[in-house]
Amino acid sequence: MAVVAEPQQPDLREPAGWRRSSNRIATWLMVLAFVLVIIPLGFVLFTVISKGASIISWQFLTGSPIPPNVLPAGIGGMWPAILGTIEITALATVMAVPLGVLGAIYLNEYGGKNWLAALIGFMSDVMTGVPSIVMGLFIFSIWVLHFGFSGLAGAFALGCLMLPVVIRSSDEMLKLVPDSLREGSYALGATKARVTATVVLPAAIGGIVSGALLAVARAAGETAPLLFTILTVTTANPNVFSGANTAIPSQIFANATSRILRPPV
């Protein structure tokens, strides 16, 4: 007859001092790690606010920037860059977000393991790792050389950078929707398209929106693609589809590399 060993129970009579001490040590280590992560961000925010708060004014927000290499009579403004950023980012969002969500729906609900789903997944992974400057050069070679600089070219570049982020984040959110919701809808006779539109998407909409906002935030801060696509001018261009344009990241780069702003050697 085999003897089954009983599982050993912890001796609760032993002093709990070591357990409490180890818990405190772990807690303080996590707090320290959190502080070490926050310190650089706090330093950046403090520097930006302390050095830039005195410059922010209505004139700065509504005025035009001073052309590079021109002796300034004032600090200039950022209105053309603000308008350009809104236009280009909005157009890139309109291009990338619907296409990315539709791609994620196909991957998760329709594609399964067929060749098209595998191709979409592979290309989204590859595009995620493409440097932004390479994407800018790509749009420059296939669009700008033929049609000229424009906000539309910048939107194409930013949209290509946003697309894989939207696809992957939306795909992960759709995977989190319980299969029981789908099965219950199918049991009621709903079609796959109706289940996707009325059950799956509403259940995952919060995560999809969060992923889209992350993609928008990334696109709005990109500089390299815009240097090759919009030209960066000092006047506002409300027509995002034609003519050179500007944006906040590219305008900051132009200001930083302007000779008039360089310290004497």
Task: Please identify what each model-predicted range represents.
Residues 21, 25, 78, 82, ...:
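Hydrophobic alpha-helical elements at and bordering transmembrane segments
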Residues 39, 85, 89, 93-105, ...:
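Hydrophobic positions within alpha-helical transmembrane segments of bacterial inner-membrane proteins
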